[in-house]
Structure formats: C-alpha cells, structure tokens
C-alpha cells in the first residue's frame, strides 16, 4: 500500500502528461464535510479507510525510509473512491476495487476515515480550480 503523498505525486505526473489542466491535491486532514463538498462539485476523492470498513487491525509494519524517516503501514488500510452521498439516508457511495459500487453508513465511513489518518486525494478539473476552499463557510453551504 501507499499513502496520499505518493498518490498525489504519481497522479500529477500522469495528469501533466495528459495536458488537460487537471490537478491532484492532498486533502489529508480534511473533514468528511470537505470531502463531500468536493464530491458535490464533481471532483472524485480517493479516501483511505479500512477493508469493508472493519475495525482497524492494530498490527502494523514499521520501517525506516531511505531518507531516514520512520514509516508505518496499517495492515487493514484500503483505498476507495468517494463518488456520492445521501444526507437524508446518512450514507456515502464509494467505488471499491474489491467490492464495486457500494453504500456505507456515513458515520461508520467517517470513523474509519479518521482511524486511517484522514487521508484523501482530490482530482480537480480546470474549471473547478477557482474557489477551492476547504473547511470554510462555503463547505457548510453545500453539506449540512
């Protein structure tokens, strides 16, 4: 597995090669409300959760990177694409590479997202690059 910074770097290289002006941005640390705001604006969001939203496995792998930094890998971490939500039903819709398109309880999804260090990456189209507020009043307007 890999985490958000590597995905952003790799995705941006690919997007630059395509020449369409899309950008990848690391949203790690942002609230679920911010992620839902991105989805509402047509921007797909890669999120880190646990496989099938199960409780996080406490077992971890530790190592030292070539730069001498400590690194940790959670065994049960998993990436899904957040692609929709229903506030009335309190659900999110994700595209999961293991399960396909699936709905999850929003509260459970948010909990698992937080357990895996609130990692997220958004892919933005050129027309959505202006007004890229995060954690602002604008977010509150779209997601209440």
Where are these regions (language model features)?
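Cysteine-nucleophile protease catalytic domains, especially the papain-like/related folds used
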Residues: 1-44, 117-143
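Structural recognition of the beta-strand scaffold that forms the well-ordered cores
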Residues: 24-26, 45-49, 81, 92-95
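Noncatalytic regulatory segments and standalone regulatory/sensor domains
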Residues: 55, 60-76, 83-144
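Detector for Asparagine
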Residues: 20, 26, 41-43, 52, ...
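Short, structured secondary-structure boundary patches
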Residues: 41-48, 69
């Amino acid at each position: 597995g890999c985490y958000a910074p590597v995905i952003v770097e790799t995705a941006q290289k690919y997007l630059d090669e395509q020449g369409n002006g899309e950008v990848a941005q690391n949203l790690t640390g942002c609230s679920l409300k911010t992620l839902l705001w991105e989805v509402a604006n047509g921007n797909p969001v890669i999120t880190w959760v646990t496989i099938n939203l199960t409780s996080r496995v406490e077992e971890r792998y530790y190592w030292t990177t070539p730069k001498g930094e400590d690194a940790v890998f959670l065994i049960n971490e998993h990436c899904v694409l957040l692609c929709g939500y229903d506030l009335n039903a309190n659900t999110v819709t994700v595209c999961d590479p293991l399960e396909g398109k699936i709905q999850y309880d929003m509260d459970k999804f948010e909990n698992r997202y937080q357990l895996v260090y609130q990692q997220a990456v958004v892919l933005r189209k050129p027309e959505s690059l202006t007004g890229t507020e995060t954690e602002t009043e604008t977010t509150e307007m779209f997601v209440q």
